[in-house]
């Protein structure tokens, strides 16, 4: 899929912008504060239902305005039944209002399911060296987009987990807890299996990507922590064993909501010794593997949104990454404060835009 038109009204530093990105590589160059990141933030907001930089009160609405509006037109690129779509997202007062193909949407998940955006921004490197919640969210995003029933499964597990935690806090009858344990284990085993299978698919894609971009790291796979000792006992038994402890703490201490995964290398002891540049490359390759899996399952590429791509990467790695991006038929949005040397060979296969004072001008 690729965006054919993006309209911003009263969003961050933009007053009114009507912009037409091209298929393929789109480079956005401008000084800090010019609006480059805000442009990608708007695309991210449409694809995720939230900003990666903060909430409305943190400055999403342009100073002096009372509301904001974002409209996106995009074209599906799958070979079969490809369609055009138009979506809008507005914020008035305390309320978000969304529309998709002329219909008001009740849940933003409907919009997120239609427009697939993979974003790489300044905090994305935390995917591999921060808390496990980010890594679970990474897997769940991919499953949400390629398995139609995954959202229902995830919501069911979240609901049952909430009910069990409520019973633990209230010290309810044992029979009630056993019933919820049974349901939690049934749904939790399914959720865990889906995540594990998805991570196995990603492994097959990540290894060749990293070997091509930074071969000295020698990644050989991922370690998946199920959230309990699954190789020793099923979840229902683990819940039974942990029941006394869970009563004491007032929450469920194990299960898929405690799962995690980490890259495994043969050349280094772990992610903790990676430089920021290496961490950025590993994270970016994980995201590109996810995009590739999306294509394999759906027949089209998601939109790739890469903020400040060149920072902390030397010219050699810039070139390798961009060479890879130029080979795939995805729409890629890339920002930077200047034109890095590694980008210049790829101008012939992309478009260059200058962002300044909330205006976007095509350079070539």
UniProtKB/Swiss-Prot annotation:
Q: Look up the domain of life of the source.
A: Bacteria
Supply one GO BP term: double-strand break repair
One Pfam family from the record:
SMC_N
GO MF annotations, alphabetized:
ATP binding; single-stranded DNA binding
Gene Ontology cellular-component terms for this entry are: cytoplasm
Coiled-coil segments on the chain, per record? none
**What does the UniProt entry say about where the protein is found?**
Cytoplasm
Q: Which UniProt keywords apply?
A: ATP-binding, Cytoplasm, DNA damage, DNA repair, DNA replication, DNA-binding, Nucleotide-binding, SOS response
Q: Which residues bind ATP?
A: 30-37
Family note: Belongs to the RecF family.
Function, as annotated, reads:
The RecF protein is involved in DNA metabolism; it is required for DNA replication and normal SOS inducibility. RecF binds preferentially to single-stranded, linear DNA. It also seems to bind ATP.
- What is the name attached to this protein's record? DNA replication and repair protein RecF
Q: Which gene encodes it?
A: recF
């Amino acid at each position: 899929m690729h965006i054919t038109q993006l309209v911003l009204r009263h969003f961050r530093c933009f007053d009114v912008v009507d912009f037409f990105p091209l298929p393929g590589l789109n480079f956005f160059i401008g000084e800090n504060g010019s609006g480059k990141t805000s442009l990608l933030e708007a695309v991210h907001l449409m694809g995720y239902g939230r900003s990666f930089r903060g909430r409305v009160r943190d400055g999403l609405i342009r100073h002096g305005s009372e509301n904001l509006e974002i409209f996106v037109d995009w074209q599906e690129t799958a070979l079969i039944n490809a369609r055009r779509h138009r979506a809008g997202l507005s914020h008035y007062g305390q309320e978000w209002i969304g529309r998709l193909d002329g219909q008001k949407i009740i849940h933003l998940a409907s919009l997120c399911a239609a427009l697939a955006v993979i974003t790489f921004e300044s905090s994305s490197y935390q995917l591999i060296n921060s808390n496990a919640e980010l890594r679970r969210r990474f897997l769940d995003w991919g499953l949400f987009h390629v398995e139609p029933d995954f959202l229902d499964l995830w919501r069911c597990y979240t609901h049952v987990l909430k009910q069990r935690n409520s019973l633990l806090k209230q010290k309810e009858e044992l029979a009630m807890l056993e019933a919820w344990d049974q349901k939690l284990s049934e749904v939790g085993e399914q959720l865990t299996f889906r995540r594990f299978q998805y991570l196995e698919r990603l492994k097959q894609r990540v290894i060749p990507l990293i070997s091509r971009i930074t071969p000295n790291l020698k990644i050989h796979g991922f370690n998946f922590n199920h959230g309990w000792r699954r190789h020793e006992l099923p979840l229902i038994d683990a819940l039974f064993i942990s029941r006394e402890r869970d009563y004491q703490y007032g929450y469920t201490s194990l299960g898929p909501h405690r799962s995690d995964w980490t890259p495994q290398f043969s050349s280094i002891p772990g992610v903790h010794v990676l430089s920021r540049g290496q961490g950025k490359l590993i994270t970016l390759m994980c995201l590109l593997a996810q995009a590739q899996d999306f294509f394999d399952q759906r027949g089209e590429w998601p939109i790739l949104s890469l903020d400040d791509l060149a920072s902390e990467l030397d010219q050699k790695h810039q070139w390798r990454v961009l060479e890879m991006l130029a080979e795939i038929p995805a729409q890629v949005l890339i920002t930077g404060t200047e034109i890095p040397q590694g980008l210049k060979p790829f101008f012939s296969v992309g478009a260059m835009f200058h962002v300044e004072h909330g205006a976007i001008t095509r350079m070539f």
